Amino acid sequence: MTRKEKISFSRRDFLKGTTLTTLGVALGLVSPEVLSSQETKKERVVIVRDKNVQDADFKVDKNIFSKLLDTGMSNLGGDNDPTKVWKKLFSSKDIVGIKISQMMTPTHKELVELIFSNLLKAGVNDKNIYIWDRDRVGIGSAEMHSLPKSLGYAKDHFSNVIKKSTALINVPGMKSHWLAGAAFSIKNWAGAVDNAVEYHTEDCCSSFGALVANPEIKSKCRLIILDGLRPLFNGGPQVDPKYLWSYNGVILGFDHVAVDTVALKIIQNKRDEYKKEKWVLNPPPLHIALADTRYKAGTSDLNKIELIKSGWQEGVLI
Amino acid sequence: MSNFLECKTSVLPLNRVGVELVSTQSRTGLNSSPTLPILCFNLVAISLLVLFFQGVIMANQLKSLFPQKAKDFEKSDQAKIFDRKNLYDYLDGGAELYLAYDFQRLVVQDYKSGETSITVEVYSMETSQDAFGLYSLDQEGEDVQIGDRATYGSGLLKFWKGNYLVRITDMSGNDRFIEAILDLGKNISQNIAPKGKPPELLAKLPADGLVPHSERFFHKQIILNNLYFLSTENLLNLNEKTSAVMGDYLLGKMNLKLLLISYPDTSIAKYAFENFCNRYLKTSLSGNRVIQKVEEGKFAGAELDKKNLWLTFESRDEKATGNFLRNLKKR
């Protein structure tokens, strides 16, 4: 399947639930019972939250955030010692690229710092950690916030940071998006290519899944940490602050599509809660379901996701 | 507007440079009989310089809209300026929204008071109709008397005046700096001289039953799909040459959405009508009006009226939808 292949999908298809059924389920339009209940290996997705991770002025408590991330990594890796999980994923031989988002609802700096310190504990050399968004790159902890360098792009449009890296961590923000419906881990890779405009198409950006299905990303991305401290549930990427809310959590996983499906369910439920009626995302985030059905990049079927929730449960919305 | 005046005077030397380029070549003797390529080169160079300085003038015009301070907030850092080519640097994934209207330039200026900041964005559009169009996409909030139309809510002031859309944001999402935000808005609005003119098509939306602040104006498919997802395909043949208005209606107990599209000519309108009926409603045509039951027990309607195509969605009453469409044609 090529990136530019067109999709024909209407509102009526959407409401019938006969096409992209998993999307209909995630948006609450189709009963989950229509999905297969066959026992298969499930993709693990972890949600961990803490009510006090940020205060009323949205100042992050880094100690609480550190414990929250430790819990998340332990749950994801199935080991009480989070450092062991980091060490299973990354080693001193790795060059690690951390793809953040700097757009409008940016990845929190505190989260970047915590990832850095955990990578160092896992044995990764400070100078072998690249952090970037688009072509703003920082190498090592001294440049992790200033991102002063520019490394450019390869002929296949992917960032040279991806080419240099042996391992990638995807650390996007969590938001609704006026053109793509939603922007989580899959869409974050649009900030790692120099032809992003070709993916921002009027067919609801249906081809973002091609990015995560590309071997450059599929083979290298070892961890996804979705920054859900203060997500956006309407509009986006431009922010109307009334649609931001303190979810105070992160969502972790290995499968982009599974992580995004969980995030989508949370955003959709937040919208319904806000309006006190069904308030479906416009346009529907087709790219998440298509990343599964068209690009085979992961699962968008909630029945095939092993969801582990810990910490603050009030308002978890899934 | 002092910056604007300063900038205007700086254009004069540019014109002289342009003249000088031509006359220098004459003096060298290379052009005792000027060749076409050299003339073309000069013209292109002059045009590029003029365009460049026009851009500088426009950017300075925009910058001159910003007051130095408002309440406890003062300008901080340099204003950032974006045009159609680099808007993606500011709004990656969001630029298409503005480019779907006739966006020209954006100036972003931060104001700070201690550690807190307010961000002001001034979007300059080619026409006041398109500035209104952008404003119309989200009119939630309380009405305030700033510009041609304005709303404020949860730390965000949006207003439209003339060819400009202005957003002033405090990301906290509360009203702690409402006075400074409104003060900034009033100051900026006063610096924008001409009032705007809303799109004429807007007047065709019936006033009876129109939900306040629900009217939208746009041209393209990507905006329609953001307001009301219809299809990944451009079934209604929307593009920069079409104009569309949309509104929400409450008619007795019936809700519906009304969309009116104005096409450049009748044949394009007819094609769009037929395409919509065949491919979306999946029904055969008989005349210029169609009402079709769709999912969730709702009805969609379409009525072709010369260059205009009226469409209704979300209605639960077939008969009332028919009456509504019939009355529209009389407008």
Where are each of the predicted segments found?
Chain B
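Intrinsic disorder/low-complexity segments
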Residues: 1-50
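Soluble, non-membrane globular domain cores that form compact, hydrophobic packing
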Residues: 53-331
